[in-house]
Curated annotation (Swiss-Prot):
This is UDP-N-acetylmuramoylalanine--D-glutamate ligase. It comes from Microcystis aeruginosa (strain NIES-843 / IAM M-2473). One of its GO terms (cellular component) is cytoplasm. The keyword Cell cycle applies. ATP binds at G113, T114, N115, G116, K117, T118, T119. Its EC number is 6.3.2.9. Coiled coil: none annotated. NCBIfam families: murD.
Length: 449
């Protein structure tokens, strides 16, 4: 019996294990963590005949090696155990690649980029599904990809949000359509250099039959048609700003979306704020038209699209203050976009687990629009120093989300603020398991005011 080792007892790892077990593999799942909830999951999986090892890493010391290793997205591709596995000739892949092996008979729409992936993925799914297609979203949102394989449905399209981590471990995944939303420095602690990060992202587009790129992203625009001669480009700046052949472009003209020379819909049908969300919409429309979806379905989907949780999500209004949850803004560029999208003066809640990157545009937005910054998490002291050195004095280190929300409500009237914006510019892992948990906590606290 062929043997498979799965690393990571999360949703992706469990789905991968069940796929392989169903196909007759002997499956061992390992996770270096241990907790009562994981113990309960272990008990359930072992009833299914899946071996689960908690509190330990995979070992390749024994002579009885696995034929296949599947890694969850959070496991670094350059982890020593994975380097050793590849040196030993063991087939080593990510969960998304395993799903591709099961589901490659269906066309895939793959969306990657530093920022904008989730909203673009959600917009694509809404449009494709409004057209009556069986087109679930997976990857970073929706299902784990292997959960779709377990369903054994016939999918018209698979719409996958794909991170750089997942691309690294998915060497054969080849979408019918690939979208690249944005490119700015992020995850450099894992990928080391901007060039490495770029090449990882680019590899997915290079394997895609058709490429859609955001012409309003400065880095992608700089690379331009020299590297992506056959791409379909988008721009909210109009036809004149398009790269490449305008007849293959999607752009805004007099507040209408124009795709490949045809009027599609008024852009103001989209309820989400911000130019960046219009950019996301244009890429989704480009994908829909390339997939043959009619204008009527596109228009209806845009008009009814509710937005995405944790991405400039309106939570409530308290004493004239709008509380906005932008917890997904985990780097400086995303947080700067968040500030650009809300009215001023704003009260900003920022901080968490800091990332490497260029904070200058973000700090410039703070100086232009923010009445007070409330700093939380591990980055609070460092952010305070940076704001001070930039000549910005109106900040407070409040440490926790509870204090931040309460303090924002207190300060709002005196500062004549219009909005309280959680847009952290940081990862969440110092205080929360994920940006979703952080945003949910902010939402709960805001609604309790």
């Amino acid at each position: 019996m062929a043997k498979a080792a799965i690393i990571g007892l999360g949703r992706s790892g469990i789905a991968a294990a069940r796929c392989l077990k169903r196909d007759g593999w002997q499956v061992t799942l390992s996770d270096r963590s241990d907790s009562p909830s994981l113990q309960a999951t272990k008990t359930n999986l072992e009833r299914e005949g899946i071996i689960v090892n908690l509190g330990q890493n995979l070992s390749l010391e024994a002579s009885d090696l696995p034929n296949l290793i599947v890694v969850s997205p959070g496991v670094p591709w350059d982890a020593p155990i994975l380097i050793t596995a590849r040196e030993k000739g063991i087939d080593t892949i990510g969960e998304l690649e395993l799903a591709w092996r099961y589901l490659q008979s269906s066309p895939w729409l793959g969306i990657t980029g530093t920022n904008g992936k989730t909203t673009t993925t959600a917009l694509c799914a809404a449009i494709f599904q409004k057209a009556g297609l069986n087109a679930p979203s997976c990857g970073n949102i929706g299902y784990a990809a292997c959960e779709l394989a377990l369903k054994a449905d016939k999918y018209d399209w698979i719409i996958a949000e794909i991170s750089s981590y997942q691309i690294e471990s998915s060497r054969d995944l080849s979408p019918k359509i690939g979208i690249w939303t944005t490119f700015t420095p992020d995850h450099l602690s894992r990928h080391q250099t901007l060039e490495n990060y770029y090449q990882i992202k680019a590899s997915l587009l290079q394997r895609s039959d058709r490429q859609i790129l955001n012409g309003d992203d400065p880095y992608l625009r700089q690379i331009g048609v020299s590297q992506w001669q056959q791409a379909y480009w988008t721009s909210v700046q109009g036809k004149a700003a398009l790269l490449g052949d305008p007849s293959r472009g999607v752009y805004l003209q007099d507040n209408w979306i124009v795709a490949f020379g045809e009027l599609i819909a008024p852009v103001n049908l989209l309820k989400m704020v911000g130019s960046h969300n219009q950019q996301n919409l244009l890429m989704a429309v480009a994908a829909a038209r390339l997939a043959g979806i009619e204008k009527k379905a596109i228009t209806e989907a845009i008009a009814t699209f509710p937005g995405v949780a944790h991405r400039l999500e309106y939570v409530c209004t308290y004493k004239g203050l709008d509380f906005i949850n932008d917890s997904k803004a985990t780097n400086y560029d995303a947080a700067a976009v968040g500030l650009q999208s809300v009215p001023s003066p704003a009260i900003l809640i920022a901080g968490g687990e800091a990332k490497a990157g260029d904070d200058r545009a973000w700090i410039a937005e703070i100086k232009a629009k923010v009445a007070t910054v409330l700093l939380i998490g591990d980055a609070a002291a460092d952010f305070a120093r940076r704001l001070q050195s930039a000549g910005y004095q109106d900040y407070e280190c409040v440490e926790t989300m509870d204090r931040a929300v309460q303090r924002a409500a207190e300060l709002g009237p005196a500062k004549e603020a219009k909005v309280v914006l959680l847009s952290p510019a940081c990862a969440s892992f110092d205080q929360y398991p994920s940006f979703e948990h952080r945003g949910t906590h902010f939402r709960q606290l805001s609604l309790q005011l």
